[in-house]
């Protein structure tokens, strides 16, 4: 099965591991609109667009899959594949609540311009990335007991928000780092994400080996 076909479906934990992916979740930011896309993979397709944007409107149009207008905003390394699937699913559920179930309430809480519309500059609405960060924090709070085993690689320090105000009080042991990059080049970003994936798989294998050794000793 080609990589492109593989990412057009939701994938369970066992499949991700067998296919050679790392236990990660990816957040991509649209450079033109500010919208954020969630993916189980270091890339995305129309499938992720359809899943993430189920109730598009003129303020929140269904975005294009053009790779040059998307930039990786964050990569989350999880301790195992089940948790990576759980975080991805919860992010998608929270997006559905914001865009469909409680769309009016969500819009009421957003910063408005003089016309009463969600504030924007040109086509860019910063509220979408802010909401994505808030939702990610909410999802990781569900894994508070294993927070020291979770690492979030951010596009930059500014993107995560105020660490002392929003993160440390509730997730003090969560690991934060920033993505190493020289510029906004898709090929370079792809290489960085591939390297992060390899590191995450190595860490997963190392932890499992330690757990297996500890179990053998206890027996």
UniProtKB/Swiss-Prot annotation:
Give the main location.
nucleus
- One MF annotation (Gene Ontology) recorded for this entry: structural constituent of ribosome
One GO biological process this protein is involved in is: mitochondrial genome maintenance
Subcellular compartments: Nucleus; Mitochondrion
Q: Which InterPro entries match?
A: Ribosomal_mL67 (IPR024629)
Keywords of the record, alphabetical order, are: Mitochondrion, Nucleus, Ribonucleoprotein, Ribosomal protein, Transcription, Transcription regulation
Cellular component, GO annotation = mitochondrion; nucleus; ribonucleoprotein complex; ribosome
Locate the transmembrane regions by residue number: none
List S-S links within the chain: none
Function noted in UniProt:
Transcription factor involved in regulation of RNA polymerase II-dependent transcription. Also involved in regulation of mitochondrial DNA recombination, maintenance and repair, and generation of homoplasmic cells.
User: Could you tell me what this protein is called?
Assistant: Large ribosomal subunit protein mL67
